[in-house]
Amino acid sequence: VTRASNTFRALRHPNFRLWFVGQTISLIGSWMQTMAQQVLVYRLTGSAAALGMVNFVALIPLIPFSLWGGSLVDRLPKRRVLIVVQWLMLIQAALLGGLAWAGLVKVWHVYLLSFLLGAVNAVDLPARQAFTTDMVEGKEDLTNAIGLNSAMFNAARAIGPALAGLVVAAVG
């Protein structure tokens, strides 16, 4: 068995492969949204402090709600939890996008919606991690799946803001 095939062996599981691709797209979009929110706040205020505040506000709910989110994921069907949180993220993004598109967005809207997104992420992140283990039949590829999932998360963290920067540069 070659080294490359060992590196990606969890992708031989169809459910994990589909999950991996879908999660890659979703996370790149999430990181693009984070960058877009930062650009929006800076354009609204011209303030570096306000820019820092939007990131802080998004992180506030992660600490207390992550404990609850992990417990919730352990008690409910993970797939259903993920579907609900993805819909909530879509609604949050649509609200923010709609306000910005209509020219009605205020900084407090961005702060509030960032806080709500942080609360949803507190459930989404443990659900994603737990669901990954369900996508690999048998446990011989589980460590590989977890490693690929982690690498993909970090790649999305790099690619998403870079793509958002290109979009902002092109569209304005």
Question: What are the functions of these language-model segments?
Answer:
Residues 1-172:
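Alpha-helical transmembrane-bundle signature of multi-pass membrane transport and export proteins
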